[in-house]
Amino acid sequence: DVERSRGLGDVYKRQGLHTMNNNINNAQKAEIIAHALPHIQKYRKKTVVVKYGGNAMINDELKEAVMRDLVLLTTVGIKVVLVHGGGPAINKTLEKMQIESKFENGLRVTDKDTVDVVQMVLAGKVNKDLVCQIGNMGGHAIGLSGMDGNMMKCEALDDCHGFVGEIKEVNTEVIEEVLNHNFIPVISTIGYDEKGNCYNINADTAAAAIAGALKAEALVSMTDIVGLLRDKDDDSTLIHKVYISDTPALIAEGIISGGMIPKIDSMTQALREGVKKAFIIDGRVPHSILMELLTDEGMGTMFRSR
């Protein structure tokens, strides 16, 4: 791997790619594409699982940029699996239905009424909107939930969170079938148990479990932060590369804390199950996934086993 060491300012200079187009000539554009070739070859015919959430789902321009990027990746032969959340859309619908949203340790407390809304919004609204948008970009996608094809079998996480699921088994057959037909599987994080009960699953947990089961080349988590920071108030302290053996020390130092702990725990488990690399990137930056996967420098934090 090329050493991931450069100033974060370089990344944010590239944030406005739509404005840069006015300032570079065709030869420079061609050179940018040519520089991506080794990275395209590295990931071609390999599987990349993308966890999609945060502000990139709310902002229409960012959403369009993400879907366009995913279509580009599939066009050059990379197998993309999109796993999405939908917290803001769920909150909005619950508010309309006058159902109170409650959270415990960063997870939504999900009673029977709430899980019905979660299923309706994630599988019926958010999922289909993403499939439609990919289609409008010239791509091909199929919307799935963790209940389809016996994909994600769960049991209740604990007694406190209600119908929040802990994944016990991932069946990748339907995902692989969709990928083999050059479609993007767009997966909403709804699972089920042996009794047929429906469960809400944390999107980070689901994406990591799916990536591990697929033995994916990479797991990419799009977030509302630039990556893992030594000082959470200073973006210039971005840590570019982390080995999973280092994570206990980073937790002890408080560098990994709060809601970042379960996210990185999930990534660590995926790496142990055979995923080659995992990334946390800033979904607020247009084309961040292309910058991470198709440039020498990357832009977020990369996690590896060794």
Which residue stretches match the model-derived regions?
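Nucleotide/pyrophosphate-binding catalytic subdomain
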Residues: 13-284, 291, 295-297, 304-306
